[in-house]
Amino acid sequence: MTFDKLPIGSTVGIIGGGQLGKMMAQSAQRMGFKVIVLDPDEACPCQHVAHDFINAPYDDTEALKQLGERADVVTYEFENISAEQLKDLAASYNVPQGYEAITLLQDRLVEKQTLEAAGASIVPYLELKDAQSLNQAVEEIGYPFM
């Protein structure tokens, strides 16, 4: 997969307007990009720094399409968005991060298994299905655990 350099003055669309979105927007602006943000909270931190703002829920298909149409590239600030909707967005618009990582990040067990398979050092974990598996985790991992 190859990506062309985004020309200065292009518009970056960000799904999510929290603190991370705000920092992303400010960095993009310092590099000469315009920023449009989609967030359900009209008082979100990013709303005050973005060039344009779409006030809509993250799962609003029409709002996501509007963001895709108005931005040269679309990114997201967190994993709490629908991987399926992100997949649909990436099929028609420039979403270089894709949706695959979101799919992994939304299931913490799959996330840990994927990192472990890739050779990353991670803390011990067990899948908790019921009270018995919780007791097993206490015995095998010990306290504290999350």
Predicted regions located by residue number:
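ATP-binding N-terminal substructure of ATP-dependent carboxylate-amine bond-forming enzymes
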Residues: 1-106, 110, 132
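Active-site nucleotide/adenylate-binding loops and adjacent lid/helix of ATP-dependent enzymes
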Residues: 104-146
